[in-house]
Amino acid sequence: MENIRNFSIIAHIDHGKSTLADRLIQECGAIEDRKMSDQVMDTMDIEKERGITIKAQSVRLTYKKDGKEYILNLIDTPGHVDFSYEVSRSLASSEGALLVVDASQGVEAQTIANVYIALENDLELIPVINKIDLPAADPERVKADIENTIGLDCTDAIEVSAKTGQGINELLDAIIERIPAPSGDPTAPTKALIYDSWFDSYLGALALVRVFEGEIKKGQEVLVMGTGKTHEVIDLMYPHPINPQKTSTIKTGEIGIVVMGLKNIGDVQVGDTITDAKNPTPEPIEGFEEAKPFVFAGLYPIDTDKFEDLREALNKLKLNDAAIAFEPETSAALGFGFRVGFLGLLHMEVVKERLEREFGLDLIATAPTVTYKVKKTDGETIEIQNPSELPPPQEIDTIYEPYVKATIITPTEFLGNVLNLLSEKRGVQLKMDYITQDRVMLEYEIPMNEIVMDFYDKLKTVTKGYASFDYEPSGYKEGDLVKLDIRVAGEVVDALSIIVPKEKAQYKGRELVKKMKELVPRQLFEVAIQASIGNKIIARETVSAMRKNVTAKCYGGDITRKRKLLEKQKEGKKRMKAIGKVQLPQEAFLSVLKID
């Protein structure tokens, strides 16, 4: 056991942790050079394209130092805020972490969030300054930056360039010297933490575990404590991005893949504890929580016959991503579809893209919403995920909306813009600290609803891409909210309803109908587009009718003749308007997402 080191890599997006992982793997010779590819740990196409890590991956490396052979278990973590639960489980499985910071950029909000998780788990942190080969690199400034924001001593920070491979050997030596070996009682009952799980079409649902006490053997009956079900261990493997090695036992302090022939990934949820069925451990590992979706959106197939295909695709994705929740719903405008819950906006984009890419579906997504709590006048409290479920105004006593605590780091020159954006989004300042003279860290409370739409894009725009942002949920607060409906030709279009703060309703309504006017195709009769709160219309635009020139065939002659033809046309238009239906184009639904 004293020769094992378990460590994770913590970094903000784009600070180079997947490349660093590549170099460590190459240096330890775990993959032959000819099979090596960039970002070998990111296995999904979409991860490579966007340059982000979505699923945590692991690899077991061997490294010789001073004549001893060491086993290094590298646990790669996702860097994005939506996947922070996966990060916290990966860190709980390690004894140490490499804090990777870009030498040209300095500390970012995401890094800080993950460092706090690491400190809560008492991990040994090794600061690593990456990308020192860049002309803009300034390692000394970055070290000062880390000391100011995190209070971590950087005198023996390690400077590396993952791209050129400079400093990698020093880093491996530091991992062995500074990260403690795992502790735990090898004779105690089995106790292992599932820190990742995924679905393999041949082997079923697989659990990636870290064994804390005892060991897991092939053929053992094990109990998964969160579900209370027992399974037989069919196979055990050590993780590797290309060819995992089989083994007969995973011992205390090691990481490995457990194959139990499961059909459903819900049986091995991330954060759950595996123990021996006959001699279970008394307490599960703490900190297990079911992944809770925060953002909801409707997903509808453009071709309505594809509803069953979408159901099947969602079921398959859920095997791989336990954080998705979904239930069928219908909309008068869009037909049959599903209300799907996601961890956040990036998660939503990734899921939609995977559905379209891996299952060949054409989908339309409605505006994302959050879960509101509504206290009704009869004292009952209900939760709603879809604006169209909101009860009529006379039945509502109060509406509560979810808030988040956001941490934003921005260069000082853009501070004014950022503060304006935050007050526009109804944010409340908690604190403001200057990290260095030219960078500020802000803490704000913001309604989740304001973040869901386009907050991140806007923050990047007003700071020219330099600000970074991270958030965590902070509970519910009372809000002065109303439901804004859009009526086309007198009928409410359910898929376009949104919940907005009362003081913004007028403005949003006006903007929306203006936008809709450009998108609704002209009909043979005039179409009124209205925004309403309950029965009160607050804004209106009219799409004028297309008309035929009915008087073209009259040459000269009496005006009454022309008038008769025009009156007749008018009557016809009136009749059409009474029975006419308007087909809305796809763009109309997407326009709701884009109003400010």
From Swiss-Prot:
It catalyses: GTP + H2O = GDP + phosphate + H(+). Gene3D superfamilies: 3.30.70.240, Elongation factor 4, C-terminal domain, Elongation Factor G (Translational Gtpase), domain 3, P-loop containing nucleotide triphosphate hydrolases, Translation factors. InterPro entries: EF-4, EFG_III/V, EFG_V-like, EFTu-like_2, G_TR_CS, LepA_C_sf, LepA_CTD, LepA_IV. Its EC number is 3.6.5.n1. Residues 2-183 form the tr-type G domain. GTP binds at D14, H15, G16, K17, S18, T19, N130, K131, I132, D133. The keyword Kinase does not apply. SMART domains: EFG_C. The keyword Cell membrane applies. GO terms for cellular component: plasma membrane. Its main location: membrane. It is an enzyme of class 3 (hydrolase). It is a peripheral membrane protein. Pfam families: EFG_C, GTP_EFTU, GTP_EFTU_D2, LepA_C. One of its GO terms (molecular function) is translation elongation factor activity. It is found in: Cell inner membrane. Required for accurate and efficient protein synthesis under certain stress conditions. May act as a fidelity factor of the translation reaction, by catalyzing a one-codon backward translocation of tRNAs on improperly translocated ribosomes. Back-translocation proceeds from a post-translocation (POST) complex to a pre-translocation (PRE) complex, thus giving elongation factor G a second chance to translocate the tRNAs correctly. Binds to ribosomes in a GTP-dependent manner. NCBIfam families: lepA (TIGR01393), small_GTP (TIGR00231). PANTHER family: TRANSLATION FACTOR GUF1 HOMOLOG, CHLOROPLASTIC, TRANSLATION FACTOR GUF1-RELATED. This is Elongation factor 4. It comes from Nitratiruptor sp. (strain SB155-2). The lineage of its organism: Bacteria, Pseudomonadati, Campylobacterota, Epsilonproteobacteria, Nautiliales. The gene is lepA.
